[in-house]
Amino acid sequence: MKKISILGSTGSIGTQTLDIVTDHPDKFQVVGLATGNNIQLLSEQIRQFRPQIVAINNESQLEDLKSLISDLDYTPIILAGKEGVIEVARYGDSESVVTGIVGCAGLLPTIAAITAGKDIALANKETLIAGGPVVLPLVEKHRVKLLPADSEHSAIFQCLQGVPTGGLKKIILTASGGAFRDLPVEKLPQVTVADALKHPNWSMGRKITIDSATLMNKGLEVIEAHYLFGVDYNAIDIVIHPQSIIHSLIELQDTSVLAQLGWPDMRLPLLYALSWPERIYTDWEPLNLVKAGSLTFKEPDHQKYPCMGLAYAAGRAGGAMPAVLNAANEQAVALFLEEKISFLDIPRVIEKVCDRFAIHNTSTPSLDDILAADNWARQEVSNCLIANPV
């Protein structure tokens, strides 16, 4: 029985992780839950899974949460604020922490979990994108496992099992192409928030769905793959695969190509991250190749997806530049979701912020440097819009 804590328990990653726990009560026990604002769903999760410790990031909702569970026959530890989330991350009884918090907000709790000796099921890619130079040495120092829990990096990780050192030649990340994969470039200026949120294959949160539409999600995954697998950016490719059946591939030195296939279902990579190196039986629908039909591929259009090139450039620049890219993207996507900028403004804003940061970048940033760069980039997005409206 593995004891786990879940950061972001009411979001897409968190609820699907809890589905896994429900399906496998003999394998996993929830000891900690943390979320941002959704106290109604959190209270229901507390009733069902009876964690030992919970946290709500929004401190103003603490008393309301306590009231919602006041009739329980047990009393979990209930905390609030960023420090409360960090306490859940490093809570003593948990063996593994699922990091499902969206964005750079997941960085400090993940670091707290690592320094407390917890294995990490990494569903928060921003942890490595922004904090890779700091996080990876901590993983090595504290001898914990950092296991990818998103579909693409889990696919790569699975394909690499048994590949000898030096055998890997190239990583190939597959992308659905997002909501606008079949839309002509000239029609992008007219797209709305509602249009961008219509992902053709995956059910995900709002922010990551927009990232999929811009292909920034895949660009961020390139940076994450670089850190996770130690592969040069020149050896990481992106290919559009509309069916989302092949979750990613690796090419070996002898030109053999290995791939991991399955229906688009986030539960599979989450389960593997929690159960590795075991393979746990499930009654989920297996992939039927005949039902899936044809699998198609095409090169991504760099004119249509400029965010992809911005991510490669930030990754190659290194230092704190990926943190700046990530923060600028988070802010730009939030503004788009609020209908304050257009869809095409997202890459324009990001490029401006990254260009302005270039002279400030350092090759070996500390955690404080990374956090400062993150804060700077968020403010700079506002400055860009005030000084030079996009």
Swiss-Prot record:
- What residues does 1-deoxy-D-xylulose 5-phosphate bind to? 125, 151-152, 176, 199, 212, 217-218, 221
Q: Which GO terms describe its molecular function?
A: 1-deoxy-D-xylulose-5-phosphate reductoisomerase activity; manganese ion binding; NADPH binding
Q: Which cofactor does it need?
A: Mg(2+); Mn(2+)
GO terms classed as biological process: isopentenyl diphosphate biosynthetic process, methylerythritol 4-phosphate pathway involved in terpenoid biosynthetic process
Q: Where does Mn(2+) bind?
A: 150, 152, 221
Q: Which InterPro entries match?
A: DXP_reductoisomerase (IPR003821), DXP_reductoisomerase_C (IPR013644), DXP_reductoisomerase_N (IPR013512), DXPR_C (IPR026877), DXPR_C_sf (IPR036169), NAD(P)-bd_dom_sf (IPR036291)
Give residues annotated as binding NADPH: 10-13, 36, 38, 124, 126, 205
Q: Which domain of life is it from?
A: Bacteria
Keyword Repeat on entry: no
Coiled-coil-forming residues are none
Record's Pfam families?
Answer: DXP_redisom_C (PF08436), DXP_reductoisom (PF02670), DXPR_C (PF13288)
Q: Which NCBIfam families match?
A: Dxr, PRK12464.1
**What does the record give as the function of this protein?**
Catalyzes the NADPH-dependent rearrangement and reduction of 1-deoxy-D-xylulose-5-phosphate (DXP) to 2-C-methyl-D-erythritol 4-phosphate (MEP).
PANTHER family referenced in this protein's UniProt entry, alphabetically: 1-DEOXY-D-XYLULOSE 5-PHOSPHATE REDUCTOISOMERASE (PTHR30525), 1-DEOXY-D-XYLULOSE 5-PHOSPHATE REDUCTOISOMERASE, CHLOROPLASTIC (PTHR30525:SF0)
Record family assignment: Belongs to the DXR family.
Q: HAMAP family attached here?
A: DXP_reductoisom
Task: Supply the name of the protein.
Answer: 1-deoxy-D-xylulose 5-phosphate reductoisomerase
Please name the source species.
Answer: Microcystis aeruginosa (strain NIES-843 / IAM M-2473)
> Lineage, please?
Bacteria, Bacillati, Cyanobacteriota, Cyanophyceae, Oscillatoriophycideae
